[in-house]
Amino acid sequence: MVINSSNVAVTADFSRAHGTLIVHACTKAMTAPVEWVLADLTKAPVKLDWYNQTISPSMVRASFEWSAGSGMAAKIASGLKAIPHIRFEVTEMSSGPDFNQRFCFTPGLGIFRADVN
């Protein structure tokens, strides 16, 4: 998997799923661990564009588009949920028989998964 100039992770074999990670809020100190999780999963360096979260001044936000094999959204959600004070959602749209899915996470409520169409 490689990261193109638009900061989109793309697999060399054009796998069957793509999606978006939206980090709604994360402390500035945890931005590097978020990028490390994504780099570990994509096997390529990841540098996100972080923006101040206007609702919570001590937090930042970012988004990341990816393309990979089916199941990548679950891997991203599993990797990120261990990061303190993060709030995110990740979607996966599959071109095969697998379900499209969305994972949402907040520290107080934990992780939520739903099939989407």
For each feature predicted by the language model, list its residue ranges.
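Long, contiguous binding/interaction regions
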Residues: 2-18, 22-60, 67-117
